[in-house]
Design a protein with these regions (language model features):
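Surface-exposed, polar/charged faces of alpha-helical domains
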Residues: 27-31, 42-93, 97-100, 104
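Bacterial Sec signal peptide processing site at the extreme N-terminus
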Residues: 2-26
């Protein structure tokens, strides 16, 4: 009887990994947008240093990125510090256009 009962004992299922809360996801979205802006900024600097375009054009492109970063942080301020998926999508479209202007 004991051996048949012991055979029925099943190890409990491990608890599922906790899902990140929506605010953490929103913060991560903002962090991703900021990281992309930082990468594009470095590309602008590299292109200016390599002579692909003059410093005034590089300055204009940096200004464009600064405006997008400010938009991102303004949007985030409305939601307690993070971005919604739709906001991130809009910002990424703007960054796609900026990347095209930079020459990526």
């Amino acid at each position: 009887l004991l051996s048949s009962l012991a055979a029925c004992v099943v190890a409990p299922q491990p608890a599922p990994a906790p899902r990140p809360n929506p605010q953490q996801i929103a913060y991560e979205r903002l962090h991703q947008v900021d990281g992309r802006i930082d990468n594009l900024s470095r590309r602008i600097d590299a292109h200016v240093n390599q002579g692909y375009y003059p410093p005034p054009q590089g300055g204009a492109l940096h200004h464009r990125l600064d405006v997008i970063r400010q938009e991102a942080h303004d949007m985030a301020a409305q939601h307690g510090g993070g971005l919604s998926g739709d906001e991130q999508r809009v910002l990424n479209q703007e960054l796609d256009n900026a990347a095209h202007a930079i020459g990526e």
